[in-house]
Amino acid sequence: MNNGINVNSEIGKLKSVLLHRPGAEVENITPDTMKQLLFDDIPYLKIAQKEHDFFAQTLRDNGAETVYIENLATEVFEKSSETKEEFLSHLLHEAGYRPGRTYDGLTEYLTSMSTKDMVEKIYAGVRKNELDIKRTALSDMAGSDAENYFYLNPLPNAYFTRDPQASMGVGMTINKMTFPARQPESLITEYVMANHPRFKDTPIWRDRNHTTRIEGGDELILNKTTVAIGVSERTSSKTIQNLAKELFANPLSTFDTVLAVEIPHNHAMMHLDTVFTMINHDQFTVFPGIMDGAGNINVFILRPGKDDEVEIEHLTDLKAALKKVLNLSELDLIECGAGDPIAAPREQWNDGSNTLAIAPGEIVTYDRNYVTVELLKEHGIKVHEILSSELGRGRGGARCMSQPLWREDL
């Protein structure tokens, strides 16, 4: 396997993919913290792990190397104690701590562990009852900080490895995530990308040190020259235009077109890939609820303009826009839930539109969305069904749970 990144489509044969196996962080969700941690329910960890292992084995059985972000982080921090210390300092600063009693106590506690255990603990979260730290500040005794059981909050969304970063061509975006609950995830990515030999010299199109937000579920690689990005609850239009400029200007980038698709800004449709995915050269899944009653949706084609500016063309027909940027005479939009007014929103809620292509016309998706699965098969798609009862409680499907590192070029 070649090192680095090579993702020039959504559908090229999947050869290497980044995952995170759900761990103790999932059991550190409570009914009181679900909203803050972006969950609607609490998965049963034992079954979620079995389901995730089945998902990973499905990918391996079909020729993909599975790489775990927690293992990459462990390798980086084991190699350099200086990098480990720098990371911990960065992590604690972003969590709001400064040198002093709590900061020093957390540093001592985390560095006393093996590196593997430290990484697992960072994902799981550090409870206040794990450390004997004298509480002297009022904020430790009253208010929201005092009510929090954790010094470092758990990262239960981490099994959705799509979002903290996005492989794009030969490079990657490391993302400024929208909500604090997920921001440490892309900090881990930042240190892995900067220090792991696997990614030496990999270009970073955009790092996480921005004020505007973007998440990988909104970033779709349509082909070697075109990316689609959702204007969504989690990704801003300003970010998209800035990223387009960066891609157009960088000589290592092959991208000259960005298709911005505006979708409803709500939790059920948090990213573009929850309502729209590419599954073949000319076939896509789509949730019809992203369009108005007349079938219209705001779509914008961004291309290089004069004086390093970006030219923007506005359309309201998704199918026409896709045909234009992909140079296709026809394409097949396959509706989630067969477009049924009950089945479509039900199956979209359970990630029926969130499919992972592992080759052209061959996908992995949840078994529970049987209306969509049967329709996909009728349209000639080869479907690998994976278990979903617990993983799906996190509101993400097969694409959400995976970050391709290497795909064969088409």
UniProtKB/Swiss-Prot annotation:
Q: Name one Pfam family in it.
A: ADI
What GO terms fall under cellular component here? Answer: cytoplasm
Please give the pathway this protein is involved in: Amino-acid degradation; L-arginine degradation via ADI pathway; carbamoyl phosphate from L-arginine: step 1/2
What's its EC? 3.5.3.6
Per UniProt, the keywords (alphabetical) are: Arginine metabolism, Cytoplasm, Hydrolase
Q: Which GO biological process entries does UniProt record here?
A: arginine catabolic process to ornithine; arginine deiminase pathway
The entry's localization annotation reads:
Cytoplasm
The principal localisation class reads cytoplasm
| UniProt keyword annotation of DNA repair present | no
Note the Gene3D superfamilies from the entry.
Arginine deiminase, L-arginine/glycine Amidinotransferase, Chain A
Catalytic reaction annotation:
L-arginine + H2O = L-citrulline + NH4(+)
Enzyme class at the top of the EC tree: hydrolase
InterPro entries (UniProt xref): Arg_deiminase
Annotated active site: 400
HAMAP family in the cross-refs: Arg_deiminase
Q: Which family does it belong to?
A: Belongs to the arginine deiminase family.
User: Per its record, how is this protein called by name?
Assistant: Arginine deiminase
Q: Which organism is it from?
A: Lactococcus lactis subsp. lactis (strain IL1403)
